[in-house]
Amino acid sequence: MRLLSVLVFLISVISIAKADYQYAFCKFNELSIGGVEGIAHLLSTDGTTLNITFDFTTSYAQNTQFAAQILTYGYNPSSMTNLGSVFDPTNVKTAGCPSGTPRAGDIGNIQANGGNVEAQTISLNIPNIKDDANSIIGRSIAIYGGSYDCSDPSKSVIGDMISFCTIGVGNIDYSSFDKSKLTGVNTASSYSNLENAIGLAVVYNTTITKGDYIEGRVLFKALNSSFIQVSAKVSGLSYQAHGFHVHQFGDVSSDNGTSIGGHFLKTGQEHSLPPSGTRHYGDFGNFCAFSQDMMDTGYYYYETDHVTAALVIGRGMAVHNFTDKGNSDVGGSRCGQGVIALIQDADYSLNLPMDWKWDVICANGSYYGDMSTSMNSESYNDNEPGSSSTVIPFFALIIFSIIFALL
């Protein structure tokens, strides 16, 4: 009996010592009003309670509190402040403060001192940052100039949105949390079964970039239950092939691109180029198509069933200085980075020139897409056999050799 008790105790200790956790990161965007600059950390150590810690400064020095909400979408390419309704997966519909029975996205009021907020934590029980229908990874947190009336939420005047941030999977190594208490692994994730997911990353330059200012967008859109379409347009790039990857973390706390971590992958996958079926989830090859009219703008187009759009929501993405050759040479430093946000508009498109011949391997380096008919590049797609471009010429060579021998 004593032995059984000891075993139960040891199992309990081991499970506690190796308990997984979820951590996410959110960096506030500056809007035309508010002058907000700062971040939010999201941490759950029990899978039930989500603790959101705010650290930001604003130009609203007169404010003693700010209303905060979790909104349905992480970004809107047409309107920065239209991010959908308050996140409400349980269909409560009525606004409220955490002390009552609010919608999942009603964070409540953030207390401020001279308009600034320092290390203030609010705990919520419905939203989470793990792989289920209540996950807010890829969605947004919005800050408003007004506040909730918690005694009568119907009278709340939260005012205009003064800032928002896209919630990405966080890199705990770049946080100020006591990591000695977090001995498991970070299992933060978007909801992997989210149907018809559309992800959009706004790309901006890292401090690695010298000279040109990099900016652009990368779009991940589900085509059907299996395939997604990945398209991108990024300006400020040098005329050469640039490695392109989805990374483990949607954490842009580091300006040099290191906090987004390594490539997004699952156990057993190895770094490679498309269309390898064993490559990392995040291995998308290279940008190498350029326009003669816009020589500093790189374009990308690819269709794949190797990963879903829902899985990459809330992850980071990077454009590298050089070519990813599919080996240990993955493209050098990260010159551009972004967080993949969940967006609403199913019709949104980057309007790429679809008559180009697309190449994501880029073995021949960069090329002008509008002159692709004269290029000797192959167009790669996961729904095409990767060897088809060499099999037919090989048999043609054999037949020609036989005919020549008979002459």
Curated annotation (Swiss-Prot):
Its cofactor is Cu cation; Zn(2+). Residues 407 are cytoplasmic. It catalyses: 2 superoxide + 2 H(+) = H2O2 + O2. Glycans are attached at residues 51, 205, 224, 256, 321, 364. Residues 1-19 form the signal peptide. Residues 20-386 are extracellular. Binds 1 copper ion per subunit. Binds 1 zinc ion per subunit. InterPro entries: SOD-like_Cu/Zn_dom_sf, SOD_Cu/Zn_/chaperone, SOD_Cu/Zn_BS, SOD_Cu_Zn_dom. The keyword Transmembrane applies. GO terms for cellular component: plasma membrane. One of its GO terms (molecular function) is copper ion binding. The chain crosses the membrane at residues 387-406. Keywords: Antioxidant, Cell membrane, Copper, Glutathionylation, Glycoprotein, Membrane, Metal-binding, Oxidoreductase, Signal, Transmembrane, Transmembrane helix, Zinc. Pfam families: Sod_Cu. It is found in: Cell membrane. Zn(2+) binds at residues 263, 271, 280, 283. Cu cation binds at residues 245, 247, 263, 320. One of its GO terms (biological process) is contractile vacuole organization. Its EC number is 1.15.1.1. It is a single-pass type I membrane protein. Gene3D superfamilies: Superoxide dismutase, copper/zinc binding domain. PANTHER family: SUPEROXIDE DISMUTASE CU-ZN -RELATED (PTHR10003). Belongs to the Cu-Zn superoxide dismutase family. Protect the extracellular space from toxic effect of reactive oxygen intermediates by converting superoxyde radicals into hydrogen peroxyde and oxygen. This is Extracellular superoxide dismutase [Cu-Zn] 3. The lineage of its organism: Eukaryota, Amoebozoa, Evosea, Eumycetozoa, Dictyostelia.
